[in-house]
UniProtKB/Swiss-Prot annotation:
Pfam families the UniProt entry points to: tRNA_Me_trans, tRNA_Me_trans_C, tRNA_Me_trans_M
The gene coding this protein: mnmA
Name of the protein this chain belongs to: tRNA-specific 2-thiouridylase MnmA
GO cellular component: cytoplasm
Positions bound to ATP: 7-14, 33, 126
Keyword Cytoplasm: yes
Gene Ontology terms: biological process: tRNA wobble position uridine thiolation
Length: 358
């Protein structure tokens, strides 16, 4: 009997994952991560995956379905890998995606290590995605049945080794079906609301988190147009992101948007909306899933943020770590620090971190 460690957050998806795998004959162990930094008070309510009540919810579900449950203290590695990266990206005038880093470094590295230490064959999560093992020698990541819930954008960084030890049973179900299963399993959390915020910033106010915990991260500087004319003053680059319109404090008689964050000049560059669009980007820290490496240009569809639609593009190799992406049509607010993920139909080809746009 294969043993699987299920990453249980206390939410509907991971709870149903554990119950489904037990029904399918796996020896299931539940594991919940403690990752909330000590300097931020963890919420008591049911809001986020890190709340104290969520750990209790996970324990209750594990007891309800009759499986062992462990709590793993991953605060140190979470701070080192996720929070420090989050802070450094803002420090370098980029807009990070901490969920991508968390999946790569915490769930599918640190937690997988715990799973292997427990002699588990697999780790399982409640992600809406499909993992297909040993397809022509590859472990593939594919889009979920529920296109509105598909989470492959957050998972493009998984390696072949990680995928070979990963199960994602919810990929073939809709969210509505999963909630019904939670109800059928008798879980009291079947109507629990989904967490929308960054888990370590439960009020979703990331500038408050940065200003309170990392004072001096950003310094005031000029707001400039694309010709270099100074139009005003900003309160720190981490308060802004590409495409932002609100909160600029600039009135030019027409709508203006953040076009670029210039770290060298500590300047926020603004312009009319057409200047927010770009046709190309360079991405680095590239990871490939369905191919070994990119040796020649290929056509793909690409997604530049979690909730954006895919767009047709061609990707060109720059070196082993970088690619150039040229879109068929200009894209709005291509944001350094965010991820770009490449698809061939339902299959994830790979992805990387946006370095620059042009």
């Amino acid at each position: 009997m294969d043993r699987v460690l299920v990453a249980m957050s206390g939410g509907v998806d991971s709870s149903v994952t554990a119950a489904l795998l037990k029904e399918q004959g796996y020896e299931v162990i539940g594991g919940t991560m403690e990752i909330f930094p000590d300097y931020e008070q963890p919420p008591l309510d049911e809001g986020g995956c890190c709340s104290l009540s969520s750990i209790e919810d996970a324990r209750r579900v594990a007891h309800h379905i009759g499986i062992r449950h462990y709590t793993f203290n991953l605060k140190k590695v979470f701070e080192e890998e996720v929070i420090n990266n989050f802070v450094n990206e803002y420090k370098n005038a980029r807009t990070p995606n901490p969920c991508v880093v968390c999946n790569n470094e915490i769930k599918f590295r640190s937690l997988l290590k715990k799973a292997l230490e427990l002699d588990a064959d697999y780790i399982a999560t409640g992600h809406y995605a499909i993992v297909e093992h040993n397809v022509n020698g590859k472990h593939l990541l594919k889009k979920a049945k529920d296109v509105d819930k598909d989470q492959t954008y957050m998972l493009y960084g998984l390696t072949q080794f990680q995928l070979s030890h990963t199960l994602m049973p919810l990929g073939n179900y809709t969210k509505q079906e999963v909630r019904q299963m939670a109800k059928d399993f008798g879980f009291r959390i079947h109507n629990k609301p989904e967490s929308q915020e960054i888990c370590f910033v439960p009020d979703n106010n990331y500038t408050r988190f940065l200003d309170e915990n990392y004072p001096g991260l950003g310094k005031p500087g000029p707001v400039m147009d694309t010709d270099g004319n100074i139009l005003g003053k900003h309160k720190g680059l981490h308060h802004y992101t590409i495409g932002q319109r609100r909160g600029l404090g600039i009135s030019l008689g027409y709508p203006v948007y953040v076009v670029k964050l210039d770290r060298e000049k500590n300047a926020v560059i603004i312009g009319p909306e057409e200047e927010v669009y770009s046709k190309s980007l360079i991405a680095n820290k590239v990871n490939w899933i369905s191919i070994d490496k990119l040796t020649e240009p290929i056509k793909v569809t690409a997604r530049i943020r979690y909730n954006s639609p895919e767009s047709h593009a061609k990707i060109y190799p720059v070196n082993d770590n970088e690619v150039k992406v040229v879109f068929d049509k200009k894209q709005r607010a291509v944001t350094p620090g965010q991820s770009v993920v490449f698809y061939d139909g339902k299959v994830v080809v790979g992805g990387g971190i946006i370095k620059e746009n042009f």
